[in-house]
Every structure is written in structure tokens, then in C-alpha cells.
Swiss-Prot record:
Gene behind the chain: ppc
NCBIfam families: PRK00009.1 (NF000584)
UniProt function note: Forms oxaloacetate, a four-carbon dicarboxylic acid source for the tricarboxylic acid cycle.
E.C. numbers: 4.1.1.31
Family membership noted in the UniProt record: Belongs to the PEPCase type 1 family.
Name this protein carries in UniProt: Phosphoenolpyruvate carboxylase
Catalytic activity: oxaloacetate + phosphate = phosphoenolpyruvate + hydrogencarbonate
InterPro entries membership: PEP_COase (IPR021135), PEP_COase_bac/pln-type (IPR022805), PEP_COase_Lys_AS (IPR018129), PEPCASE_His_AS (IPR033129), Pyrv/PenolPyrv_kinase-like_dom (IPR015813)
Originating organism: Haemophilus influenzae (strain PittGG)
Catalytic residue positions: H138, K545
Record's keyword terms, sorted: Carbon dioxide fixation, Lyase, Magnesium
Length: 879
């Protein structure tokens, strides 16, 4: 065991000991003894002791309603503490000393140097680097903000304890604080009592920006600059914008009726208020620092003669930011603003220009070290966040726009637009887009649904250019879907061009993406307004839910490849926007591997990717973790562009086509083809009970009366993750590979594993999923919750899972899963001891819950919700 791993185990053990002390004080010795007995039985059960396994089942099956909540909370909270310790370990000093990641920027630059890469080419590629993270409020964050704050403080304590020169008194003070924080977490309700509103979700996102990214972005840019200076011998331009932050919070109305035009407006005001607040804090500190008297002649000519010239400029900005804060505070409180727009800061350049002038003057006067202090950090924050804190995406489903235009055409006597052929729709839209007269009559009263669409477009029209990053159309299927949004924006008075982004998300839509975009690019009006720039979003969640992981990932690859080739041919700059989740079933994979498995040239214009729910906290929740995440993203993007992955060989493509067809048929044969599947799914997972957990503002279903097809991808995956069958992430994939091997093509499959990052990443993702799955636990759900006549389905699926595990092991030439990543294998093994009791308790609670759903004991309902959040913590994934 390495010293680093030993420290991690010691930290987990210490946190567990403090949790035990807290439970003893709060609940008494008897409860602590019960919890400890369950833990030991679980550990022995995992070690293969059948008697312990039966005793574990008996103990959890007979647990009283009075004891279920403290038992569920104990195991759930321990898993949260394990996550904290593991997250800290990745940024600890010990970790930094122990290993220099082969995926880091500095290691990439070393490789580039060894391979005699062109310095000019590297220079050019670094200056084009773009990482745009789009924070979304998808309901996958099961941990309350109140607890997240305490978890951050626990992390800070672990950091302090890492110093080996602490006195005994200092160590005792830190450990007492740790014990207090764990006690505070224990006495805090981990389940939200009310579902968050879209505005609450936006505030959560902005808190993440304030507490982590505000510090992380300038730190990463310093690190990036030091690396380029060391390896390339030059400093990056101060105005470079390699990191951008956008958000769907307050803008994503797809399937969420609670995100209205008014909410969007309120979130935009709040974002500006928060940005003014953060910049005001920075500027106030800067005013204390910039006491220097000497400035350049140009600076003096521009700002006048002052004893302390920099302070004069900075104090003016402080006054403007104070007025800006008051202005947006009045708007948020529905008061008439006390100050006018002319007195406040509304555009980035109003902050950037005077501060950049200060920066240049300090450099010219020999004060580079001062210029490169907190002033440079503020300039970097202006470049990344701007005075709006983040850009906002608007997202809406395509049929909502079709319905709105159809309502207009019916009113003005042109018939029903929604029933027209695609060619007729396009002709009408192009005619109206080219026309100077308005389409919508002044005295017309639209339906509430259409009014909401138009009101949203009017909110966009009220914003300055750049505040809204783009308008995303989910379930985009045709060129008219894109043109329709352009028309609605025009009719609502938007005076500038906004990127309208089609989101292709089902298997059929991904396959048709090239054809749809070709039609669009053939429209003269459209080519005229896009300025040879196009963004296209690739949907990972719904395509995997529609066709299974293997078929979906190949369709995503082919769609990206086709779009890259098409836009290169036409001289259009393409940005691919990746709608990934944290789980394998929603396109999740380790960032570096995921990016290097994309088609060649697909990252040449940078990366735009969603960061969702709990993954925001895991990857960006602490400044040091966020810096590491940016470093990994930057390294992968630069590597993909400078050392691109190989083009797949023709025989690899043929194999992937076959794998895709076979796996899709197997997946759909189960999910769509078996009439018993839906009742089995609803019985064997907590899918129905999940809707009671107030995770996010968005309903779990697009259509409340629909079946699996109407269920959103997130609860679909969340439900299967809970019962440890993990079905969406593997069904069809392993069986398809086995069929291909049995056809005598095993050699080609092995070569694909060894030489093609796209395929090897898929196999690695399968291995990770299999490591977290558990057929015995899945069987417990079936036997306790599912009608006997449906048991065959679970038995077939578990047999399929076991066969697939053997297939993947045969490819890796290993006897055990995750043999090449023992640290992860050990982490999963440790978590299983605490997750198993939560799974078995969940089975018992679901049984009690469903026995008499009209009169559920409140303790049973509360404990059930705790098991759901606890298992999510144990799996490190929700949706």
C-alpha cells in the first residue's frame, strides 16, 4: 500500500470514528452498537461469509421503524465523508508529490518537446484553447447546499491536518472543529423539505462560481502561463480567454414549466447583481494595494494628474460598482431604480479598459510584479465571467416553436403551419425572415403557451449582445426547427444575431444531423447571418436511452465526424457542444479519455460541454479540484489537436456498424420489445418513489401519463443505479462484442482496444460500470418487490450481465475488474461495505412503502429518501 493510499484510509477511518462519536452522543450506545453490528456483517458478507450475509438480511429485514432513520443516516453520512476524503486526496500535497499525472499539461508539453513538435504550432494551438463549461441544474445533485458548505469546511480541516509540524494543541483544535462539523451535519436534515425553484437552482450555481471558480480560474490561468513560459519561452496575452462559463440555470425551459420568461429575467438580474458584488469586493482590495505614485505619460493624459493615479481610477470603478449593485438590487426587489443606467457598469469593457490601462502603466513603470498580482487576477475574471457572471443559454423543445408559429399562421389565415411539408415550412420561414414587415398582428392575443415563448424571446431582446450565449433547440429534427427560432427572435425585436443551436439527441436524429445541417447551409439567408460560425449540440442522454450505450456512442461519433467534414468543406467554423452527464448511460467518462476518444479535428475550435448536477461539485466544488479539472480539459484539448487520435480503419468502422446494430436490437428488444419490461422496471427499482425526492425544479417526465419513453434520461438511469443492475450503461454492448468475437473477428476487436481511443474508452467505461454493479443485490430487489411471474426478466438480465463481465475481462486479459486501476477497485470495495446495507434497507423500505401506499409511516418515507441519497453518494453518480 502506498503512503498516499495509507493516508487516505487513515483520514476515512478518522472521519468514521468522529461520526461514531457523534451518533453515540446523539442516539445512544444501543443504536451505535446496532450500526456497528450491521457494518461488520456487511464486511464479512462481502468477504464471502454466507452466515453473515443471511444475518445481515435478517437484521435489516426486521429493523424497527424507530431505528431505520438513524441506521440509514449513519451509512449515508459515512459515504459522504468518504467522498470528502477522496476528493481531498486528489489535491493533497502528498498526492502532488507522489505523482505527476501523465494527463497534466506539463507532462503533455514534455512529450511535445520530446517529439520535436513545432513551437509555432503549439503556440498557435494554445492561443486558440477554449474550455467552455455550461453549468446545468439537472436534478442529480442529491446533497443539500447546507451540507455541501459543511463538507467544504471538513475538506479544509483535512488540508490543515496534512501539515506535519503541527503541535499537539494545534492538532486537537483542528480535530475538535472536525468533530463539530460532523455533528452539525448529523443534526441537519439531509433531505430537502421542498423542491427547489429554478431561482434557487440558479443561486446554487452562482454560489459555486463565487466559492470555487472565482478563485480557480485565475489560478489555472497563472498555471497555464507558467507552463507555456517554461516550455515555450513566452507569456500568454493578458486578454486571452481560454476559460468561459455559461449556464442553463434560469434558461433551460425544456420540459420545465417553472422556468418562465419572468424567472429568466430575474436570474439575469441576479447574475449581474452577484457579479457587481464580487467585482466590488475585488476592486475594494485593489484600491488598498495600488498606492503607487508613478504612472506612464499615456495614463496621465487619459485620466488626469493625481497623487495616487491608480487609486483614482480604481475608486471611480468602486463607485460605479456600488451604484450597479444598488440598481440591480432595486430591480430584484421590484423597486424603481435609484440610479440611472448611465451611472452603472453594464458592459465588460467599462471594467476592462481602465484596469488594463493600470496594468500596462505599471508594466511600463517597472512594476511588473505588482501588475501581475491581484490586478491580473481581476482582468482574468473579467475575461472569463464578465459583468454578467456567466452567459446564459436558452433551451426549449422544438415542437413548442412549431406550435407557436402554427397558432400565428392559423390566426392570419394561412392554415396550420405544423401540418405543412418541410419544403413549404422552409419557404415560408425564409420569406418571413427576409421580409421587413412584421408577421405578428398587433392586437392578437396568443394562447398562454405561445405567449410564454414570445415573452422569452422579448426578454432576450432586452439584453445586450453576448448576455445570451445561444438558443438551444432540443429534439431538433429539421432545418425548419432552426429557422423557426430565428423568426420568433426577429418578430420579438431581437436586434442582433444569436447562435441558434440544434440539439440532435435520438439515434435517428444523430444519423440525420449531416443532412439537416446541409439543408440549412444551403439557405442563402442563413449563411448570410451565421458569419461562417455554427454550433451543434450532441445529446448523449436521450440517444443512450433510445438505443443503448454502444449504438448511441457510435452514432454520436459518426455525427460529429460528418459535421466536421461538412463544415470544413464549406469553410464554416464548427463548435460541437457536448450534452454529457456524469454517468456512463449519459455519456460520462473521465474527462481526458472522453475527449481523446472523439473524432480527429472535432476539438479544433475548443470544447463546450455541460457540467451537470453532482458532477459540478465533484469536479469544480473546490478551487484546487477545479484547477485540476481545467488542467485535464486543457491538456486533452491540446493533445487532441496537436497529437490527434488515429482515423478509424475501414474494418474498425465495419465492426462498429455491426456492434451498433446488434447492441441496439438487443437493447430495444428488452426495453421496448418485452411487454413485461415496464412493470418489471417499475417494481424492481425505486423509479416511482424517486419522484417524491425534491431534487430539482424539473418534473421527472416530459409527459406525466407516458411510459419509459417519456421518462427523462436522468431518473431512468438514477433508478437502475439504485438497484445496482446499472442496466442503461451496458445492456446490449457486451453481448454484441461476444457475437462479433464468435464470428471469428476477435483479433480485430483486440486491435481496436489497443489502438483506437474511442473503442478502448468504451471498454474502460463498461469495466467501471460492471465494478459498481451487483447481481446479488439486484436479486434481492426482485425477490422482495417483483411479482414471481416477472422474475424471469431479472434472471435473464443478470445472466447477461455476468456473461458481459467475462467478455470484457477476456479483452483486458485480466482475472478481475479494474486490475489496472487498483486505487479505484479498492475505493469501490470500501464503499460496498457501507452501500450494501443501504441497498438492503432500501429493499425493505420499498416493501413497507408499497404495502400500504395510502398510509405510509413518515419514518419509512424519510428513511427511503435517505437510502436513495446515500446510494447515490456511494456510487458517486446519480444521473
Amino acid at each position: 500500500m502506498t503512503q498516499e493510499y495509507s493516508t487516505l484510509r487513515n483520514n476515512i477511518s478518522m472521519l468514521g470514528r468522529f461520526l461514531g462519536e457523534t451518533i453515540n452522543d446523539a442516539q445512544g450506545e444501543d443504536i451505535l452498537e446496532l450500526i456497528e453490528n450491521i457494518r461488520k456483517l456487511s464486511r464479512n458478507s462481502r468477504a464471502g461469509d454466507d452466515k453473515a450475509r443471511q444475518a445481515l438480511l435478517d437484521t435489516l429485514g426486521s429493523i424497527s421503524n424507530e431505528n431505520i432513520i438513524p441506521v440509514a443516516r449513519a451509512f449515508s453520512q459515512f459515504l459522504n465523508l468518504t467522498n470528502i476524503a477522496e476528493q481531498y486526496q486528489t489535491i493533497s500535497r502528498e498526492h502532488s508529490l507522489a505523482q505527476s499525472s501523465s494527463q497534466s499539461l506539463s507532462e503533455l508539453f514534455k512529450r511535445l518537446k520530446e517529439q520535436n513538435a513545432s513551437v509555432e504550432e503549439v503556440h498557435k494551438t494554445v492561443e486558440k484553447l477554449l474550455i467552455e463549461l455550461v453549468l446545468t441544474a439537472h436534478p442529480t445533485e442529491t446533497t443539500r447546499r447546507s451540507l455541501i458548505h459543511k463538507h467544504i469546511e471538513i475538506n479544509k480541516c483535512l488540508s490543515k491536518l496534512e501539515h506535519h509540524d503541527l503541535t499537539e494543541k494545534e492538532r486537537n483544535i483542528i480535530e475538535r472543529l472536525l468533530l463539530r462539523l460532523i455533528a452539525e451535519a448529523w443534526h441537519t436534515n439531509e433531505i430537502r423539505t421542498v423542491r427547489p425553484t429554478p431561482f434557487d437552482e440558479a443561486k446554487w450555481g452562482f454560489a459555486m462560481l463565487e466559492n470555487s471558480l472565482w478563485q480557480a480560474v485565475p489560478e489555472f490561468l497563472r498555471q497555464l502561463n507558467e507552463t507555456t513560459r517554461e516550455f515555450l519561452g513566452y507569456d500568454l496575452p493578458v486578454g486571452l480567454k481560454p476559460v468561459r462559463i455559461s449556464s442553463w440555470m434560469g434558461g433551460d425551459r425544456d420540459g420545465n414549466p417553472f422556468v418562465t420568461a419572468q424567472i429568466t429575467k430575474k436570474v439575469l438580474y441576479f447574475a449581474r447583481w452577484k457579479a457587481a458584488d464580487l467585482f466590488l469586493q475585488d476592486i475594494s482590495k485593489l484600491a488598498d494595494e495600488l498606492s503607487m505614485m508613478k504612472c506612464s505619460d499615456e495614463f496621465r493624459d487619459k485620466y488626469g494628474e493625481h497623487l495616487e493615479p491608480y487609486r483614482f481610477v480604481v475608486k471611480n470603478l468602486r463607485n460605479q460598482l456600488t451604484a450597479t449593485l444598488a440598481y440591480f438590487d432595486d430591480h430584484l426587489s421590484n423597486r424603481t431604480p435609484r440610479v440611472s443606467e448611465s451611472e452603472i457598469i453594464l458592459e465588460d469593457n467599462q471594467l476592462w479598459e481602465p484596469l488594463y490601462d493600470c496594468y500596462q502603466s505599471l508594466i511600463q513603470c517597472g512594476m511588473r510584479i505588482i501588475a501581475n498580482g491581484s490586478l491580473l487576477d481581476i482582468l482574468h475574471r473579467i475575461s472569463c465571467f464578465g459583468v454578467t457572471l456567466s452567459q446564459m443559454d436558452i433551451r426549449q423543445e422544438s415542437t413548442r416553436h412549431t406550435d407557436a408559429i402554427a397558432e400565428i399562421t392559423r390566426y392570419i389565415g394561412l392554415g396550420d403551419y405544423s401540418q405543412w411539408m418541410e419544403d413549404d415550412k422552409q419557404a415560408f420561414l425564409i420569406r418571413e425572415l427576409s421580409s421587413r414587415r412584421p408577421l405578428i398582428p398587433q392586437n392578437w392575443t396568443p394562447s398562454p403557451e405561445t405567449k410564454e415563448i414570445l415573452d422569452t424571446c422579448k426578454v432576450i431582446a432586452q439584453q445586450k449582445q453576448g448576455v445570451i450565449a445561444c438558443y438551444v433547440i432540443s429534439m431538433a429534427r429539421s432545418a425548419s426547427d432552426v429557422l423557426a427560432v430565428h423568426l420568433l427572435l426577429k418578430e420579438s425585436g431581437v436586434p442582433y444575431h444569436i447562435p441558434v443551436v440544434p440539439l440532435f439527441e435520438t439515434l435517428e436524429d444523430l444519423d440525420a444531423a449531416e443532412k439537416v445541417m446541409t439543408q440549412l447551409f444551403n439557405v442563402g439567408w442563413y449563411r448570410g447571418v451565421i458569419n461562417n460560425r455554427q454550433m451543434v449540440m450532441i445529446g448523449y442522454s436521450d440517444s443512450a436511452k433510445d438505443a443503448g450505450m454502444m449504438a448511441a456512442s457510435w452514432a454520436q461519433y459518426r455525427a460529429q465526424e460528418a459535421l466536421v467534414n461538412l463544415t470544413e468543406k464549406l469553410g464554416i467554423e464548427l463548435t460541437l457542444f457536448h450534452g454529457r452527464g456524469g454517468t456512463i448511460g449519459r455519456g460520462g467518462a473521465p474527462a481526458h479519455a472522453a475527449l481523446l476518444s472523439q473524432p480527429p479535428r472535432s476539438l479544433k475550435n475548443g470544447l463546450r460541454v455541460t457540467e451537470q448536477g453532482e458532477m459540478i461539485r465533484f469536479k469544480l466544488g473546490l478551487p484546487a479540484v477545479a484547477v485540476e479539472t481545467f488542467d485535464l480539459y486543457a491538456s486533452a484539448i491540446l493533445e487532441a489537436n496537436l497529437l490527434p487520435p488515429p482515423e478509424p480503419k475501414p474494418e474498425w468502422r465495419t465492426i462498429m456498424d455491426e456492434l451498433s446494430t446488434i447492441s441496439c436490437d438487443i437493447y430495444r428488444g428488452v426495453v421496448r420489445g418485452d411487454k413485461d419490461f415496464v412493470p418489471y422496471f417499475r417494481s424492481a427499482t425505486p423509479e416511482q418513489e424517486l419522484s417524491k425526492l425534491p431534487l430539482g425544479s424539473r418534473p421527472a417526465k416530459r409527459n406525466p401519463n407516458g411510459g419509459v419513453e417519456s421518462l427523462r434520461a436522468i431518473p431512468w438511469i438514477f433508478a437502475w443505479m439504485q438497484n445496482r443492475l446499472m442496466l442503461p450503461a451496458w445492456l446490449g454492448a457486451g453481448a454484441a462484442i461476444r457475437q462479433i468475437i464468435e464470428q471469428g473477428k476477435g483479433d480485430i476487436i483486440h486491435k481496436m482496444c489497443e489502438n483506437w481511443p474511442f473503442f478502448s474508452t468504451r471498454i474502460g467505461m463498461l469495466e467501471m460500470v460492471f465494478s459498481k454493479s451487483d447481481t446479488w443485490l439486484s436479486q434481492q430487489y426482485d425477490q422482495r418487490l417483483v411479482k414471481k411471474e416477472l422474475w424471469y426478466l431479472g434472471e435473464n438480465l443478470r445472466k447477461q450481465l455476468e456473461d458481459d463481465i467475462q467478455t470484457v475481462l477476456s479483452l483486458s486479459h485480466q482475472s478481475k475488474l479494474m486490475s489496472d486501476l487498483p486505487w479505484i477497485a479498492d475505493s469501490i470495495a470500501l464503499r460496498n461495505i457501507y452501500t450494501d446495507p443501504l441497498n438492503l434497507l432500501q429493499v425493505e423500505l420499498l416493501h413497507r412503502f408499497r404495502e400500504n401506499p395510502e398510509q405510509v409511516n413518515p419514518d419509512v418515507e424519510q428513511a427511503l429518501m435517505i437510502t436513495i441519497t446515500g446510494i447515490a453518494a456511494g456510487m458517486r453518480n446519480t444521473g
